[in-house]
Swiss-Prot record:
It comes from Chlorobium luteolum (strain DSM 273 / BCRC 81028 / 2530) (Pelodictyon luteolum). This is Imidazole glycerol phosphate synthase subunit HisH. Heterodimer of HisH and HisF. IGPS catalyzes the conversion of PRFAR and glutamine to IGP, AICAR and glutamate. The HisH subunit catalyzes the hydrolysis of glutamine to glutamate and ammonia as part of the synthesis of IGP and AICAR. The resulting ammonia molecule is channeled to the active site of HisF. Pathway: Amino-acid biosynthesis; L-histidine biosynthesis; L-histidine from 5-phospho-alpha-D-ribose 1-diphosphate: step 5/9.
Length: 201
């Protein structure tokens, strides 16, 4: 069973429908206690970083997610969910993150590319990856974001993507923590394969 954390931040129902389409049981809940017994947890999200981390704190997910990872469970962040895993964010001020991956969330700066990035873009794989097993390098995925993750440890970066004059980190994979900046549930067959790979790893 895949547990999808409901903390009031967007795209969780579309993520659940994608798992349903794949025939993978998935449940949505705002109660961290119901994570017990679920080895796979998904942290989706669309919205503002500060409001999201406050909601995670209020609902008790902040400690529960850390405990889940510490016990060997797998955690998968999508879009804002990926950003929340880092140490801090500069989105509309300065905010503490979950601190599961050392690094910061930064705003794109560009005179040439329109921000936010909205649409399809390709990934460049940086390591042998569980998430991207069976997916060709340079495959395209669907992005919607104005901020990007800047991890301190290069070893945690699973893929990068070129936008706004930089190769930013578009996927993370390390010690049972997985995350993607794009929306796999909106990324056709390649995106569905990412979800399948997470559920089956």
């Amino acid at each position: 069973m895949v547990f999808i954390a409901d903390y009031g931040a967007g795209n969780l129902r579309s993520v659940q429908k994608a798992f349903d389409y794949l025939g993978i049981p998935a449940t949505v809940s705002s109660d961290p206690a119901k994570m017990a017994g679920c080895r796979k947890v998904v942290l989706p999200g669309v919205g503002a970083f500060g409001q999201a981390i406050e909601a995670l704190d209020r609902l008790g997910f902040t400690d529960a997610l850390s405990e889940h990872v510490d016990k060997g469970g797998h955690l998968f962040g999508i879009c804002l969910g990926m950003q929340l895993m880092l140490s801090d964010s500069e989105e509309m001020g300065s905010h503490r993150g979950l601190g599961l991956i050392p690094g910061s969330v930064r705003h794109f700066q560009s005179d040439s590319d329109k921000i936010p990035q909205i649409g399809w873009n390709s990934i460049d794989l940086k390591q042998e990856s569980v998430l991207f097993r069976g997916i060709a390098d340079h495959s395209f995925f669907y992005f919607v974001h104005s901020y990007y993750c800047d991890p301190l440890e290069a070893s945690s970066i699973a893929s990068t993507t070129w936008f706004a004059g930089k190769n930013f980190c578009s996927a993370i994979e390390k010690n049972g923590i997985f995350a993607v900046q794009f929306h796999p549930e909106k990324s056709s067959e390649a995106g569905l394969q990412v979800l399948r790979n997470f559920a089956e790893c």
